[in-house]
């Protein structure tokens, strides 16, 4: 005899929750593209070109949808946006919305962005003539479904500060913090050194105060995951590129800074992009785990960071699981795929 016994409501809720998580994982594995806004400094390190190349490759595979690209910092040649547009155009995506930070700091001269601007097809204006990153952010976010957008920050947090403290405008009646709270699913940040240290993206050129303000005021409903200096610094990718990488924008960028084409380059930004799109693992291969429970404390003067165990602000940082050489091979395999033939 079969007896029907009603399950308690809390058990039903738990089972439904597990089913939804499982269905979400299956959907992501079979083509539900992650909606991404990438916020890059694109200044002196060709690794930003690597990261954008990787994101376009993941988009070609159906794993990501690039909603917009914005540049932060002040590249003195005013060619950061053009370099971004070169890569997107190379991959057949010339119409991705593109904006630039208008704040005038921190300043640096790039040895490769003007080369990309002058030698490869694109349609972007110099940074001064591009739309503001703030306008691009608000316009793109306003059009997206709630809790659907992953922001990838691989530079300074200056644009995010502008968005966070922005007022309602033509795009949305929501203030910036409320627009983020409603539309953003997750923020992935290349920044900091964990459990403590000083790192470039949080500290260079007087951005410590900005870093402090963003992380203090970010809505706790939207998780932040940090990919620290120690994560990318141990993964040297691209040692085979001198022999295997075809001529094009990425090869040119790597040739003109840090001898990166010959020796490879640390993979800070690329790994942040990889996490933003694939999460902690892919097809049964675990890349990282999360250190959770607590938050980052920032010194506003120096930009130095310390992980505190309390209060819990829905922040976490990546902890390496897959050995660096294997992560490098994951990146290289994707980068060397090149643009999908249209």
Language-model-detected regions and their locations in the chain:
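A general, composition-driven signal for non-globular sequence regions
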Residues: 4-5, 22, 29
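Short stretches within intrinsically disordered, low-complexity N-terminal or propeptide regions
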Residues: 8, 15, 27-29
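Bacterial N-terminal signal peptides
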Residues: 13-24
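N-terminal secretory signal peptides that target proteins for export/translocation
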Residues: 1-9
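N-terminal acidic, glycine/proline-rich low-complexity segments
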Residues: 30-342
């Amino acid at each position: 005899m079969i007896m029907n016994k009603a399950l308690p409501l809390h058990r039903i809720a738990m089972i439904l929750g597990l089913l939804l998580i499982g269905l979400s994982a299956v959907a992501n594995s079979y083509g539900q593209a992650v909606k991404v806004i990438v916020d890059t400094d694109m200044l002196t390190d060709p690794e930003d070109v690597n990261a954008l190349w990787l994101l376009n490759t993941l988009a070609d595979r159906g794993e990501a949808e690039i909603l917009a690209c914005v540049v932060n910092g002040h590249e003195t040649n005013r060619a950061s946006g053009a370099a971004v547009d070169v890569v997107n155009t190379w991959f057949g995506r010339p119409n991705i919305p593109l904006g630039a930070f208008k704040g005038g700091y921190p300043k640096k001269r790039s040895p490769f962005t003007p080369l990309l601007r002058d030698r490869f097809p694109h349609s972007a204006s110099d940074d001064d003539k591009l739309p503001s990153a703030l306008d691009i952010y608000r316009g793109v976010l306003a059009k997206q479904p709630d809790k659907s957008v992953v922001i990838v920050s691989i530079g300074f947090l200056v644009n995010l500060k502008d968005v966070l403290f922005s007022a309602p405008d033509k795009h949305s009646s929501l203030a910036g913090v409320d627009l983020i709270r409603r539309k953003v699913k997750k923020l992935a940040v290349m920044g900091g050194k964990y459990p403590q240290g000083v790192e470039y993206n949080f500290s260079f050129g007087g951005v410590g105060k900005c870093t402090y303000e963003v992380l203090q005021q970010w809505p706790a409903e939207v998780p932040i995951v940090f990919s620290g200096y120690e994560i990318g610094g141990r993964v040297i990718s691209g040692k085979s590129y001198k022999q295997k990488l075809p001529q094009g924008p990425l090869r040119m960028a790597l040739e003109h800074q840090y001898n990166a084409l010959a020796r490879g380059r640390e993979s800070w930004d690329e790994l942040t992009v990889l996490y933003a799109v694939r999460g902690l693992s892919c097809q049964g291969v675990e890349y990282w785990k999360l250190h959770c429970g607590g938050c980052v404390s920032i010194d506003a003067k120096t930009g130095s960071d310390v992980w505190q165990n309390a209060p819990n602000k829905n922040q976490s940082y990546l902890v390496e699981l897959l050995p660096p050489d294997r992560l490098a091979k994951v990146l290289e395999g994707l980068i060397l795929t090149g643009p999908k033939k249209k």
